């Protein structure tokens, strides 16, 4: 009888733990979703303030001062909902899971590679953002896989803390491997000697045209917007 009672209690405890576990795992994504939407609202609030500026230029310097000293720009991609600050810190992993206000957030933030200069004067400036479950950050870059959308949307903009607007012409898209020389090598600088080699890398992994390849020269400043194939996919 005692053994039966003990087994009965053990079973009840296991059932309770199972219920708690089920609740936790169903609650956790919901909590993340709410937190992510709250962060989206904060960015929208900042956006409302910045669009009041002359020429619709986000006041990056003011956002940096009032919100987060890690803000190094603002990215706007017409035709998508990408319209928010770019952050940068010495640790590339930090903004993978932290918000504009430095709170933990699974969808992270859009951020500039730690190796890049914050004035975007590198030959290759990698900007990262998650492909998320709430259709924000860099999720809508996937729209560029539609040829019609791609044809109609050929530019995007980065605004700097010097009140500059950098206009980028979109020249290609593609799938790059996790080990990609343009990124894994420290501060790649184009020279007359290596230009052909790096043009070859771009042509191999993207749909860039030969004409656009030939437009790339040693003084080119390229921004490479990078995300993963799927949410939680680290190999895209």
Regions found by a protein language model. Give the residues of each.
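Solvent-exposed, non-transmembrane regions of membrane-associated and secreted proteins
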Residues: 18-236
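N-terminal Lys/Arg-rich, disordered targeting/topogenic segments
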Residues: 1-7
């Amino acid at each position: 009888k005692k053994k039966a009672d003990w087994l009965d209690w053990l079973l009840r405890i296991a059932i309770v733990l199972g219920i708690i576990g089920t609740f936790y795992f169903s609650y956790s994504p919901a909590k993340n979703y709410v937190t992510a939407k709250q962060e989206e609202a904060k960015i929208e609030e900042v956006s409302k303030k910045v669009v009041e500026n002359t020429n619709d230029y986000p006041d990056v310097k003011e956002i940096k001062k009032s919100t987060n000293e890690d803000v190094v720009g603002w990215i706007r991609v017409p035709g998508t909902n990408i319209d928010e600050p770019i952050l940068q810190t010495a640790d590339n992993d930090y903004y993978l899971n932290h918000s504009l206000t430095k709170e933990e957030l699974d969808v992270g933030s859009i951020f500039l590679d730690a190796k890049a200069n914050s004035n975007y004067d590198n030959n290759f400036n990698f900007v990262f953002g998650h492909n998320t479950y709430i259709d924000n950050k860099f999720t809508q870059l996937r729209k560029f896989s539609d040829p019609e959308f791609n044809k109609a949307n050929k530019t995007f903009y980065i605004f700097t803390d010097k009140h500059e607007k950098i206009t980028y012409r979109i020249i290609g898209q593609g799938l790059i491997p996790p080990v990609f020389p343009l990124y894994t090598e420290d501060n790649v600088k184009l020279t007359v000697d290596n230009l052909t080699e790096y043009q070859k890398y771009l042509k191999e992994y993207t749909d860039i045209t030969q004409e656009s390849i030939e437009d790339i020269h040693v003084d080119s400043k390229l921004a490479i917007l990078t995300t993963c194939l799927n949410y939680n996919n680290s190999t895209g």
